[in-house]
């Protein structure tokens, strides 16, 4: 089970919730995120 757990201080990142793309925004909180270019 590979989940996106990259830490990025970029404003362009995809927040994942339960393995699904939840929303786009700043990486903040315990949510896992995957940096998107």
UniProtKB/Swiss-Prot annotation:
Disulfide bonds: 8-27, 13-33, 17-35
Subcellular location: Secreted
Molecular function via GO: potassium channel inhibitor activity; toxin activity
Keywords recorded for this protein, A-Z: Disulfide bond, Ion channel impairing toxin, Neurotoxin, Potassium channel impairing toxin, Secreted, Toxin, Voltage-gated potassium channel impairing toxin
Any one Gene Ontology BP term: envenomation resulting in negative regulation of voltage-gated potassium channel activity in another organism
Main location: secreted
Gene Ontology CC terms: extracellular region
Tissue specificity note: Expressed by the venom gland.
Known function: Binds and inhibits voltage-sensitive potassium channels. Inhibits the vertebrate potassium channel Kv1.1/KCNA1 with low affinity.
Record's comment describing the protein's domains: Has the structural arrangement of an alpha-helix connected to antiparallel beta-sheets by disulfide bonds (CS-alpha/beta).
Family, as annotated: Belongs to the short scorpion toxin superfamily. Potassium channel inhibitor family. Alpha-KTx 11 subfamily.
Name of the protein: Potassium channel toxin alpha-KTx 11.2
Organism: Parabuthus villosus
């Amino acid at each position: 089970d590979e989940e996106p757990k990259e830490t990025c201080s970029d404003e362009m990142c995809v927040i994942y919730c339960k393995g699904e793309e939840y929303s786009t925004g700043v990486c903040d909180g315990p949510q896992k995120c995957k940096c998107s270019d």
